Every structure is written in C-alpha cells, then in structure tokens.
Amino acid sequence: MRLDLNYGRDSYPLELRDDWDVTVIRKPAMPLQPDPSLAVRNALAQPVGASSLANEARGLKSACILICDITRPVPNGLLLPEIVRQLLDAGMNPDDITVLVATGLHRPNEGAELEELVGDPWVLKTVRVVNHFARDDAAHVDLGRTPRGTPVKLDRRFVDADLKIATGLVEPHFMAGYSGGRKVIAPGVAHRDTITTFHSARFMAHPKADNCILEGNPLHEEQLEIVRMLGHMLAVNTVIDEHRRLSFVNYGEIIASHLQAVEFTQRYARVPVGRRFKTVVTSAAGYPLDKTYYQTVKGMVGPVDIL
C-alpha cells in the first residue's frame, strides 16, 4: 500500500507492506465553496452579531486588519482584497488602513515571504503592511491585568484603530482548543510579557488546555478576557480542507463569529477511532505548518490520545 502524507510543499510517499495491519485514519470530506471569492463577499454582507463590513466602516477614519504570520495557511489573498476594497468604498483613506502581521513572538515576515503571505500585490501597494514586534515596549499599550493577573499589553496600531478586524483560520489547537478569532489578538499582537505569562506552565499544563476544548480551557478564557478589554471588534474566520481549499468563511463580532466557525469545523476535526495503536505515522500537514520545529510539534501531539 502506498500513501502520500502532506510534507513541505509537496508530499512524502509512504510504502506500507501488505502483511502489516494498517488502519488509515482520515477526517470526513469537507464541503467546498464553489466560488470562494463570492463566499467572502457574501460573508462580509451577512454578519454574525454585527453589521455588514460596509456599515461598520462607514464614518470611521482608520482600520487595522490582523493577519496570521507565515506559519498559518490562511487564504489572505482571497480575504484581504475584498476587505480593503470595502473599507476604501466606505470612505477610508488608504494611508489609514493597516494590515498588521500577527507574529506573536515569531520572527517578522519580510520580502518574498511577505508577498507570499499577503497573497495579492494590489494590497501591498495600496495599504500599509507591517509586522508586529512583541519585544518593542514603546509599540504597545498597557491595558491593565486580567482577573487571573495576566498583564495585557497590545500593539498600539491595533488598539488605536477605529475599526479592528482579525482574520484567521479556525482549526483544532493543542493549547487553545481552536485557533483563530481571539487568538490572533493574543498572542498574535501581544507584548512578550503577555505572551510569556499565559504560555506558562500555569496555563499550558491545565488538563483542559487541549485540542478541541473551549469550555474550562484557561488559555481560551484568558483570551476572551483580553478581547473584552478592547471592546467591539470584528473577525473574518476561515476553515480550509487538507488541500488548502476554502470550506467555510464567516464574518462578524469576533467572539460570536468564531464560535460559529468552531461549530462548523468540529464536525470534521474529530474522528472516532475506538482503539490504540503501537505506531502512528503522521505529519504536520505540510507547508507552512511544518516550516518550523515548533509548528511541527503539532503533528506529534495530535495522535497522542491513540498511542
């Protein structure tokens, strides 16, 4: 038997002997959007817990759009052109629109890598695209502390924007339950003091800081506290299949829209297996998810429960 695992930009061929007892575990096939661009436009016009993007932007002077860094395969080239066009149509000046790469404590994305990340040359030419730097003290606003004592310091460019939009990918996350939404803000554009506090053992060692768990997950709950300290924010959430094709997109108030995206993706994220295995062969799902050793760890922790 031959199987191909997603690996790097291509795949890794795996030859399995016929006399081996092999179980192939796949998640259910996800529905695909036949016209991804139309799906994005429809999402921006049909909000969850908010007004349409055009209405939200009307009369406001500035906007900051968060995008994940190169370690996440978010379809930015699909999302950003439509978001930026609608902000311009609402009367915003291009100089007052910032696309902020939510690097967390990762390195900045620059040059050809930034072009690949943004996915559209018109966006790069039209609005300002910049990286977040978590170690730059002066670039952050101190909003105080959460009830758990986490210091909340966030990128000034996001905090000061009239319209705040987080874009991202919603999928299982081995600490925060699910990625996307509030996670793009913290740790995405948080100061190192904020990130290192809730990435500490006090949070990460909690039994509910795990894949597919939101209720009782201290990381998720801390992220929600931080979001609430900022006030009204919007999000564009995507779900993609294993071939990076768009399956789901929505837009709206950041918490409500994220929960709707979680509800969709959890139908496909969990696969009942019913037994444990001595050996599991898997991958980190290919580029860019296996671009760094840290991200590759996610491929290791995924099958832990069936070993």
What are these regions (language model features)?
Residues 210-288:
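Membrane-embedded hairpin module used as a gating/binding unit in multi-pass transport
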Residues 48-64, 89-95, 271-279:
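Glycine-rich phosphate/diphosphate-binding loops that line cofactor/substrate pockets in enzymes
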Residues 109-178:
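An acidic, phosphate/nucleotide-engaging active-site surface
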Residues 146, 154-241:
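Conserved phosphate- and dinucleotide-binding cores of soluble alpha/beta proteins
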Residues 1-44:
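N-terminal amphipathic/basic leader segments beginning at the initiator methionine
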Residues 95-105, 237, 307:
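Short internal beta-strands
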Residues 62-73, 98-104, 281-283:
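Short glycine-rich or small-residue beta-strand-to-loop segments that form or flank ligand, phosphate
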Residues 290-307:
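C-terminal catalytic subdomain
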